[in-house]
């Protein structure tokens, strides 16, 4: 089971627009389509790809990936289709933006009801403004994950994009787990 698989997007550059306000260096602002392109050379382009779901399934088969956790949102028709057409291969997760408050909690509930959400993901350094792992804006999300008995996958440590990392210090997890001992907290990229 792959716990972070993405179905290729038609416009990969647009996929990262949410964090562009955090970029300061010239390469990230002007040159890169992919925010961590400085680490990964020859990033594949998928703009002319036909059936994105079939392509993803073929790649999963090629690498013997039986199932994959994919991100779904209320506006992502491709991920929704993949989950509906291939429930035996794809499992739903959703990203969260704690700056949106209770709107995000309602979104988690709706996606859980509609797609049997298996996890929530968070990228604290990618939030605008950034939100530390132990910030109170995350608490309603942590509580909802406990209530739904699903894990939260949180990016911790140094982020790949050239943005500040203080909000993702692993030490911040300690306080979260003290307040939420039932929370299934998974460190991603840690």
Question: Which functions belong to the PLM regions below?
Answer:
Residues 4-6, 86, 155, 189:
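Histidine-centered active-site/metal-ligand motif
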Residues 4, 60, 111, 145, ...:
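Conserved, mostly hydrophobic/aromatic
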Residues 12-13, 164-172:
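Histidine/acidic-residue-rich catalytic or RNA/ligand-binding cores of hydrolases
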Residues 113-119, 170-185:
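Structural recognition of alpha->loop->beta junctions
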Residues 58-66, 86, 147-148, 179-185:
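A structural motif corresponding to the C-terminal end of an alpha-helix
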Residues 66-67, 73-168:
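Active-site gating/metal-coordination segments in enzymes
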Residues 1-69:
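An N-terminally biased module of ancient metal coordination in phosphate/nucleic-acid-related enzymes
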Residues 1-3, 70-71, 93-94, 121, ...:
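Active-site neighborhood of phospho(di)ester-bond hydrolases with catalytic His/Asp-centered motifs
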């Amino acid at each position: 089971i792959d716990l972070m698989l993405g179905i290729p997007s038609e416009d990969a550059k647009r996929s990262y627009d949410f964090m562009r306000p955090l970029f300061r260096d010239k390469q990230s602002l002007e040159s890169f389509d992919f925010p961590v392109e400085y680490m990964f050379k020859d990033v594949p382009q998928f703009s002319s790809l036909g059936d994105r779901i079939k392509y993803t399934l073929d790649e999963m088969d090629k690498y013997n990936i039986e199932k994959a956790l994919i991100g779904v949102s209320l506006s992502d028709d491709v991920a929704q289709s993949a989950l509906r057409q291939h429930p035996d291969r794809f499992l739903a997760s959703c990203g969260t933006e704690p700056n949106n408050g209770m709107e995000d909690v309602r979104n988690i509930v709706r996606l859980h009801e509609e797609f049997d959400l298996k996890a929530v993901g968070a990228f604290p350094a990618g939030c605008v403004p950034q939100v530390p792992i132990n910030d109170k804006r995350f608490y309603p999300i942590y509580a909802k994950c406990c209530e739904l008995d699903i894990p939260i996958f949180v990016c911790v440590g140094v982020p790949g994009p050239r943005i500040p990392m203080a909000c993702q210090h692993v030490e911040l997890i300690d306080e979260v787990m003290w307040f939420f001992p039932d929370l299934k907290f998974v460190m991603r990229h840690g």
